[in-house]
Design a protein with these regions (language model features):
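Active-site beta-strand termini and strand-to-loop segments that position acidic
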Residues: 42-44, 142-145
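Conserved GNAT acetyl-CoA-binding A-motif
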Residues: 94-106
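Short hydrophobic/aromatic beta-strand or adjacent loop that forms the aromatic wall/cage
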Residues: 36, 135-140
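Conserved active-site alpha-helix within GNAT-family acetyltransferase domains
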Residues: 84, 108-126, 134-135
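Short proline/glycine-enriched turn/loop segments at secondary-structure junctions
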Residues: 58-59, 128-132
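Acetyl-CoA-dependent GNAT
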Residues: 4-69, 74, 87
């Protein structure tokens, strides 16, 4: 497959509905259509990837950052630079809007993504979260734009 033929599109409600149908409601609920940026990737008619980031005010400071709420690439399309391209596109849009930094969370089960975050200049902070009282280990990642 030639990655230069992939189509990167701003997500809209129709795309969000499509994600819900094809990838599930849980994935679709992480797509933010306002106060941020959401981009989907198509190979022909096949949805192969998406990213969504939304704005958050930082405490104690009058600056805003974007939190990458979801970054997914279909298993068959991984290791082709799609996630990197999505992050670079969101970074560019964030810079255009004067956003201070990008942040994300990468859980232990997605450890394969850590080298990508590092290669893109993100700092890593090991941490645990406790959704529903159960520990989930991983990393917070952040990059000042």
């Amino acid at each position: 497959m030639n990655v230069s033929t992939l189509l990167y599109l701003d997500a809209n409600q129709r795309m969000k509905d499509r994600v819900a149908t094809e990838w599930g409601e849980e994935t679709a609920r992480h797509i933010h259509l306002t106060h941020g940026c959401s981009i989907a990737v198509l190979n022909g008619e096949i949805l192969v990837g998406l990213i969504s980031a939304y704005g958050k005010k930082l405490p104690l400071l009058e600056i805003t950052d974007w939190y990458i709420d979801i970054l997914e690439v279909h298993k068959e399309y991984r290791r082709m630079g799609i996630a990197t391209q999505l992050i670079e596109m969101v970074s560019g849009r964030a810079r255009e809007r004067g956003i201070y930094q990008l942040r994300a969370w990468s859980s232990e089960d997605k450890a394969a993504a850590i080298p990508m975050w590092k290669a893109l200049g993100f700092g890593l902070c090991p941490a645990s979260t406790y959704p529903e009282g159960k520990e989930v280990k991983g990393y917070f990642v952040a990059k000042v734009l």
